[in-house]
Amino acid sequence: MKKQIGKNLMQKWKNKIRVRLSALDKKKLVLTNIPYILTAFYTNRASFLYRNSLGEDIGNKLLYAMEHADRILTGLQPSFNWRDMLTGIVAAVILKLLVWQKQSDAKKLRKGIEYGSARWGNAEDIKPYMSEDPWMNIPLTATEALTMESRPKQPKYARNKNIVVIGGSGSGKTRFFVKPSVMQMNCSMVITDPKGTLIEECGKMLAKGPPKKDKNGNIMKDKSGKVVHEPYVIKVLNTINFSKSLHYNPFAYIRSEKDILKLVTTIIVNTKGEGEKASEYFWVKAEKLLYTALIAFIWYEGDEEEKNLNTLLDLLNESETREEDETYQNPVDMMFQELEERDPQHFAVRQYKKYKMAAGKTAKSILISCGARLAPFDIAELREIMSYDEMELDKIGDRKTALFLIMSDTDTTFNFVIAMLQSQLFNLLCDKADDEYGGRLPVHVRVIADEFANIGQIPQFDKLIATIRSREISASIILQSQSQLKAMYKDSADTILGNCDTTLFLGGKEKTTLKEMSELLGKETIDLYNTSETRSNQKSFGLNYQKTGKQLMTEDEIAVMDGGKCILQIRGARPFFSDKYDITKHKNYRLLADENEKNRYKVEKELNPQYTPKSEEEVEVIHVELSE
């Protein structure tokens, strides 16, 4: 019995040793022990030579061994005498102990980077993040770019295409970032155009489009040898001059009750109610109930031509209440009563009944706040623009499209329309990618949001920007300072910035931005040289050299940065201090109105086929002779 227990214990120990040996890196084990094996071998040979040396005492033996020391290195046969073997093992063990002692007492020195290892990036640092095909890059600086490929050869260099661009007024956000991105023409683009000039300067180039390529990436040509181009579908929503805008109807993109709730939230967030009560939680919730009920009624029960915000306004105008007569029924009450008789569980009915719990005076206050909130829709031009839809937002990820959102940079009255569109756009494209394309749109969609802080608040944007990457959607947020984003999105601002792998700083003087930029750049280690002079009967001088840490670029250095320079930061890479992108060197610059005024895109003419050109405009006259 005892023998059996002993055998079991031995077997367990053997198994443990076998497991330990299998877990070891055998190659590393051999390489790290080669010095000790060689020490044991040559000490063994030296001991053998000493024992067989001629001489009667230790001194003579040592002299003989030293004279014939070359014999230690020439032979490959170790001595198997126990004395020689023991000497070799002891020497190897002593060496191992000395090395171990040295390593345990070693100082953890970081020579040259004691106070920080920050440095500026170079060509080798940016190379993994750029595509070999220059047309598949997002130009960032004169020397750096970011690949559009979502799955690079080395996954560790994959970065999302969300970009934060920060630059004060006049720093060249449009010229040095937006236009180079547009000139690449490598994806669909949704571009906010605060001045309405970008579409005029780039529209003709987009209408022509980039060269069409086959599956192998080769440029296609027609039978005559001319390059075949792939024109962009150009869409425009202009809230400055409605005559130069296509129509946008948010009702056209409602697919479910969930979309109704999202639309109502967007309207509430980006518009203002009436008086002090408008911002109170109760009144906002009450307004939401009424909007939800009316929009649901229109969407479910209305005719196709009635499904728009104009009908919503008409229903609000008919929703009269009388404080002195709680039993009074307005036309809207009657419509909902009829609907309830047909379908008591109807979504619109359930929302309306909750709203009708309010007393007459309260309901009247709610209606006043609703009317004030939607007051901009009383403008006939805006009502006409939103009467039907021409935007085709759900097709932007199917084909190359350029959607220009023109808004005023001085008046925010109609910016909620832009926010409404962008909110619907993100949700539409995400749903389409998941439902129809297995999670990835066939054409990447870039939202280039110039003057992002003036657009209006997009509900749950902090969550959207974290999830759109996998759907082939990206956002380029363009700001004058980081404080703008924090003012708009409060605590969510840091989450939004954290989901942007790339930051491009074009210049500015806002304190918060300068401080955060300086901290992100980190510290470098520099040599500090001090001199001292003591004056007494005898003068004495002193010199002192030491290391210290310094910000790679201090706040004041960033504030006075050369106007032609910029700072680029990509997650996982060293920061880059580079020249701003020179758009005149881009191959497509010749197609812009900046280069040739003849390339100016006539928005009104393109949107309205019956447009009559002005006397000062150049027109091309084509004579066609028709035979019988």
What are these regions (language model features)?
Residues 79, 114, 128, 132-136, ...:
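Intrinsically disordered, low-complexity N-terminal regions enriched in serine/proline/glycine
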Residues 2-5, 38-42, 159-473, 488, ...:
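P-loop NTPase motor domains
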Residues 116-118, 145, 149, 161-162, ...:
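General secondary-structure edge motif
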Residues 96, 122-128, 142-155, 362-368, ...:
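A broad, low-specificity signal for short, low-complexity segments enriched in glycine/proline
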Residues 133, 137-140, 416-423, 517:
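Conserved long hydrophobic alpha-helices within structured protein cores
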Residues 465-567:
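Conserved ATP-driven motor cores of ASCE-family P-loop NTPases powering translocation/secretion/packaging/pilus
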Residues 69-76, 83-137, 257-267, 315-318, ...:
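Short alpha-helical interface patches
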Residues 1-171, 175-178, 215-223, 523, ...:
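Basic- and hydrophobic-enriched, low-structure N-terminal and domain-boundary segments
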